[in-house]
């Protein structure tokens, strides 16, 4: 006589098992988008939050929920986003793609209909296994939950009815710590010889800055690199690269994910320049430029040699960059000060100056992060300012949600700012819809409003021969009244059109989420950018 097969696990039991596994893996933040099929997971998350094991966030829209979880993770928390079946899962795709390309450990938990219903036309049923493509394989939720892989994880959870519990859950779970990436213990020593610059792309981290200082090399660091501190950081590097100094570079040591400037891209692609890659996380670890050597462990430089033997590198190399940087910076500041009205560069500079030690700044893609790149001051080492940008795929979507999540993941006493363009703001305006009882950070959103997209004015599409098509296809003026939009969500709003007004608004945060709209011109953007590029020596 054969033993009876065990009863299948109930939806409630499955959901509680998965929530317990998430907590044991170090997840401390759960973002839920409402739905019926994910109800068992939502109830389990609610009970885990009531037990003090996680913090629960609810959002109406899955795209917002996904980027909120991404921002929480970027701030150092471990977050999971929970959604129902069907198109709800597809709306998480932008956040998942960004996480995959940036190496962010986002956890996605999607509820699903039973597998037998796939391909039958059943309501809200599609094939969710592998929905995010080969970048993010789907885990079978019937087995052990595995969260040790770098980058996003997708757990797909088929759930049978009933979808509501019979009792409250009192979880007996020991919270775990997220797994941390470990740099291999090996050490590679670089020769000082060639004229070298250090390029720090997004999320390069402080070790890139340390290497530049040890070697005495110029540091060309993007704002979100985590490296733009200390005396070796060169503010106007992208202007200098197009001049004589850039032409004399013989070697580049690159860390992180550099994506901001064409001068850096051209430098890395030059056949006469040796490129040393310090390695990177995310699916972009294979570089789009030739790499001569890759270092996955620690890195240092050899000891200085005696200049008398004629083999020492050019000891004036760093000072040449510093001197040129000071001169170009002074000319840039003078040019901007002479401009009538407020410029987007001045907005970026004011935001950078308003960021205190220990503060958080989330920067949107497109023009604002490039303007910030020219204007951010050389911050002090150890001041622990954190600049975050979604540079994995460099999209404008989800920027407000990312900023809200990143701010929620930081201590409440930390000043949090975000800088973005008006199109980026409108793209994620739904992130301002936050229900009663939800955690709300102190966050100042600075919107550079030029009534459309100005970055294309600086690209080929902005050339004079396309003027009759430009606005409709690329400039995309929208004429949205941001004050009214903010009023609809009861978000405080200030409109400024001078540097003095902007600095006053930034110096007097109201608490909670607030929007400071800085109005700038768009019609002169291409001309202004050309005059800035002409400042290079």
Curated annotation (Swiss-Prot):
This is 2-succinyl-5-enolpyruvyl-6-hydroxy-3-cyclohexene-1-carboxylate synthase. It comes from Nocardioides sp. (strain ATCC BAA-499 / JS614). Belongs to the TPP enzyme family. MenD subfamily. Homodimer. Catalyzes the thiamine diphosphate-dependent decarboxylation of 2-oxoglutarate and the subsequent addition of the resulting succinic semialdehyde-thiamine pyrophosphate anion to isochorismate to yield 2-succinyl-5-enolpyruvyl-6-hydroxy-3-cyclohexene-1-carboxylate (SEPHCHC). The lineage of its organism: Bacteria, Bacillati, Actinomycetota, Actinomycetes, Propionibacteriales. PANTHER family: 2-SUCCINYL-5-ENOLPYRUVYL-6-HYDROXY-3-CYCLOHEXENE-1-CARBOXYLATE SYNTHASE (PTHR42916), PROTEIN PHYLLO, CHLOROPLASTIC (PTHR42916:SF1). Binds 1 thiamine pyrophosphate per subunit. The keyword DNA-binding does not apply. Pathway: Quinol/quinone metabolism; 1,4-dihydroxy-2-naphthoate biosynthesis; 1,4-dihydroxy-2-naphthoate from chorismate: step 2/7; Quinol/quinone metabolism; menaquinone biosynthesis. Its EC number is 2.2.1.9. The keyword Transmembrane does not apply. It catalyses: isochorismate + 2-oxoglutarate + H(+) = 5-enolpyruvoyl-6-hydroxy-2-succinyl-cyclohex-3-ene-1-carboxylate + CO2. Coiled coil: none annotated.
């Amino acid at each position: 006589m054969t033993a009876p097969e065990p009863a299948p696990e109930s939806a409630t039991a499955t959901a509680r098992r998965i929530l317990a596994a998430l907590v044991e893996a170090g997840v401390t933040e759960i973002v839920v988008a409402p739905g019926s099929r994910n109800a068992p997971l939502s109830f389990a998350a609610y009970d885990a939050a009531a037990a003090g094991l996680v913090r629960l966030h609810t959002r109406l829209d899955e795209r917002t929920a996904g980027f909120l979880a991404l921002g929480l993770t970027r701030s150092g928390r471990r977050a999971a986003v929970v959604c129902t079946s069907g198109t709800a899962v597809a709306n998480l795709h932008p956040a998942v793609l960004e996480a995959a390309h940036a190496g962010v450990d986002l956890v996605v938990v999607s509820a699903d209909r039973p597998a037998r219903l796939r391909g039958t036309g059943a309501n809200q049923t599609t094939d969710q296994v592998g929905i995010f493509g080969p970048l993010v394989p789907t885990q079978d939720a019937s087995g052990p939950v595995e969260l040790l892989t770098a980058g996003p994880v997708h757990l797909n959870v088929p759930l049978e009815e009933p979808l509501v519990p019979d009792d409250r859950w009192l979880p007996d779970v020991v919270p775990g710590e997220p797994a941390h990436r470990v740099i291999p213990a090996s050490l590679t020593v670089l020769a000082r010889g060639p004229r070298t610059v250090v390029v720090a792309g997004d999320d390069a981290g402080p070790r890139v800055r340390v290497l530049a200082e040890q070697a005495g090399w110029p540091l060309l660091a993007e704002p979100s690199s985590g490296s733009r501190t200390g005396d070796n950081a060169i503010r106007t590097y992208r202007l200098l690269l197009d001049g004589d100094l850039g032409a004399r570079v013989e070697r580049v040591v690159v860390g992180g994910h550099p994506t901001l400037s064409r001068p850096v891209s051209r430098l890395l692609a030059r056949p006469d320049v040796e490129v040393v890659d310090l390695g990177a996380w995310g699916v972009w670890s294979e570089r789009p430029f030739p790499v001569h050597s890759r270092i996955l462990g620690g890195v240092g430089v050899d000891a200085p040699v005696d200049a008398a033997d004629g083999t020492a590198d050019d000891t004036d190399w760093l000072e040449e960059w510093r001197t040129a940087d000071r001169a170009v910076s002074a000319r840039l500041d003078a040019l901007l000060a002479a401009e009538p009205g407020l410029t987007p560069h001045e907005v970026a500079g004011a935001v950078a100056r308003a960021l205190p030690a220990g503060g958080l700044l989330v920067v949107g893609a497109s023009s604002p992060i490039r303007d910030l790149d020219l204007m951010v001051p050389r911050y002090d080492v150890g001041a622990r300012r954190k600049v975050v940008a979604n540079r994995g795929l460099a999209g404008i979507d989800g920027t407000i949600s990312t900023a809200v999540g990143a701010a929620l993941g930081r201590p409440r006493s930390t000043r949090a700012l975000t800088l973005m363009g008006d199109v980026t703001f409108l793209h994620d305006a739904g992130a301002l819809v936050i229900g009663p009882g939800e955690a709300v950070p102190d966050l100042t959103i600075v919107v550079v409003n030029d009534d459309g997209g100005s970055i294309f004015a600086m690209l080929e599409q902005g050339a004079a021969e396309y003027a009759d098509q430009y606005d409709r296809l690329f400039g995309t003026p929208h004429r949205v009244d941001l004050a009214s939009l903010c009023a609809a969500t009861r978000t405080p709003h200030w409109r400024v059109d001078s540097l003095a007004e902007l600095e006053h608004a930034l110096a007097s945060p109201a608490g909670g989420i607030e929007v400071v709209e800085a109005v700038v011109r768009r019609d002169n953007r291409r001309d202004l950018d050309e005059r800035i590029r002409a400042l290079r020596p």
